[in-house]
């Protein structure tokens, strides 16, 4: 640097000033000072070179060179490759207009369930006649396909699942869970059309592969909105996201558990989540709205429920509302034959860099129409998780739900007079889960085990097939051990 300064000074001195004695003296003095400074720096560099091991210096230079070459080669290779592996299999056109990534999710479970008060002859008698049952299952087996068409802003997603043995589904049948197209307008707006999950509760919106426990809470199973076929609009800002959804109505996931009878005995609010006829009876109108506020941190931190060691603190708040009216038959009847359904959800999540927490509440109001029955379902859930080693995490979770309402034991007349009204309150249903996660390769390869204790009776309204928590008697305090090995890419 000093030598360069001298050269610059010599170039910049005009020849016309060469005869000026004072100017030449100043230049000579500055050159002498720079020569002394340059000599001192060279001496210091020579001393440092003599103190350094020549072989070590050669190896360091070679390693740095190889690392740079490898990085350059990887960048060039990824730019040129049209097929290969990059955290998943991918295909792409040479011009970059088309891409396809192939992924999969496999969840293999061992279940042991102890029920001291089974309800014999109800549900599956092979299960209910035994206090202790155990076995293995593939809870989820999904093939995931995603990518873009024509330009990166036009995204697509396909989720092909294999059904497990559940009520109303053929075991081992391949079916479409999600199939949608989305377009990002690059001006804070995004639109999605197709079949997809309704963005209502954070627990349901977070993928099953990114949960803390083996399965979601009974509260979520009772009150989440499932999937719809329709359109979704998303408005995003650095700290706020607003999502509006409309379409063929929410698909009540609890219909397989028993709530379906209370929600819609006439199928008024219960559209199937599978591909359905556009003109089939479903809803007269449906709307769902969710607002999320990022208080601090980044949005990507809330793509799962965990907060690894060393990650930054973050917090997010979410608020959701939903309403829909079932489609009437237009056939003259003495009573209203369409059902109505409204729900509300709120949640707040924290990440502390090595630990995480979430508190959520949900509420649902159902007017089932034909019997003029009205029901209120509500509950809360709370969870906390903490790492004790970089890849090991323990967690605790509790959820509680209750249903109360009124129904007519005898129907009123066509003018609404008469009839006998009965009021009832359903017993509380609560589950405490204690568990551990071992992240062998993040969520891509993960082992999860939890032990679940039902605090009170698990009745026909709140049991969950996929959670392996079954209906039991009044004195039933179940203990369910679930251990899951997950492969995801």
Regions found by a protein language model. Give the residues of each.
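Sec-dependent signal peptide recognition
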Residues: 1-9
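N-terminal signal peptide c-region/cleavage motif recognized by signal peptidases
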Residues: 13-15
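Outer-membrane beta-barrel pore domains
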Residues: 46, 115, 129, 169, ...
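Outer membrane beta-barrel
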Residues: 84-253, 258, 281-298, 305-316, ...
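Active-site-proximal beta-alpha loop/turn segments in soluble metabolic enzymes
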Residues: 250-278, 328
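Glycine-rich, charged/polar anion/phosphate-binding loops
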Residues: 274-275, 301-306, 343-346
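Interfacial loop-to-helix transition and helix-capping segments at the boundaries
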Residues: 276-281, 337-341
């Amino acid at each position: 640097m000093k030598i360069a300064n001298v050269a610059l000074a010599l170039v910049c001195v005009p020849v016309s000033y060469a005869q000026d004695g004072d100017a030449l003296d100043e230049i000579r003095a500055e050159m002498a000072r720079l020569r002394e400074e340059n000599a001192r720096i060279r001496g210091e560099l020579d001393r440092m070179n003599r103190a350094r091991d020549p072989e070590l210096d050669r190896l360091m230079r070679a390693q740095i060179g190889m690392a740079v070459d490898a990085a350059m080669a990887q960048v060039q290779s990824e730019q040129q490759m049209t097929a290969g592996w990059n955290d998943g299999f991918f295909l792409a056109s040479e011009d970059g207009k088309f891409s396809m990534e192939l992924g999969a999710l496999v969840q293999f479970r061992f279940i042991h369930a102890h029920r001291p008060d089974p309800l014999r002859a109800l549900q599956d008698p092979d299960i209910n006649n035994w206090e202790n049952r155990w076995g293995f299952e593939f809870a989820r087996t999904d093939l995931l396909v995603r990518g873009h068409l024509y330009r990166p802003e036009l995204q697509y997603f396909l989720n092909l699942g294999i059904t497990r043995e559940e009520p109303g589904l053929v075991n081992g049948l391949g079916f479409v869970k999600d199939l949608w197209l989305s377009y990002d307008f690059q001006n804070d707006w995004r639109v999605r059309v197709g079949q997809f999950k309704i963005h209502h509760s954070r627990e349901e919106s977070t993928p099953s592969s990114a949960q803390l426990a083996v399965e979601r809470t009974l509260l979520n199973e009772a009150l989440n909105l499932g999937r719809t076929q329709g359109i979704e609009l998303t408005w995003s800002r650095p700290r706020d996201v607003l999502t509006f959804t409309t379409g063929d109505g929410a698909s009540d996931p609890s219909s397989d558990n028993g709530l379906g009878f209370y929600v819609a005995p006439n199928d008024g609010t219960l559209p199937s989540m599978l591909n359905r006829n556009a003109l089939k009876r479903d809803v007269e109108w449906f709307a769902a709205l969710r607002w999320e506020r990022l208080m601090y941190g980044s949005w990507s931190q809330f793509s799962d429920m965990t907060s690894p060691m060393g990650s930054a603190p973050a917090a997010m708040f979410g608020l959701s509302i939903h309403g829909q009216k079932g489609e009437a038959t237009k056939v003259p009847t003495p009573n209203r034959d369409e059902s109505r359904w409204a729900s509300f959800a709120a949640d707040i999540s924290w990440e502390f860099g090595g630990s995480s927490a979430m508190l959520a509440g949900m509420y649902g109001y159902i007017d089932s129409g034909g019997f003029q029955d009205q029901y209120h379902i509500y509950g809360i859930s709370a969870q906390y998780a903490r790492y004790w080693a970089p890849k090991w995490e323990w967690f605790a979770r509790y959820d509680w739900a209750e249903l109360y309402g009124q129904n007519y034991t005898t129907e009123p007349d066509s003018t609404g007079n008469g009839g006998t009204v009965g009021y009832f309150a359903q017993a509380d249903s609560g589950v405490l889960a204690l568990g551990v996660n071992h992240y062998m390769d993040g969520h891509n390869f993960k082992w999860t085990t939890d032990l679940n204790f039902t605090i009170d009776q698990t009745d026909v309204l709140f049991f969950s097939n996929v959670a392996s928590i079954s209906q039991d008697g009044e004195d039933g305090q179940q203990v369910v051990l679930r251990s899951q090995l997950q492969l995801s890419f």
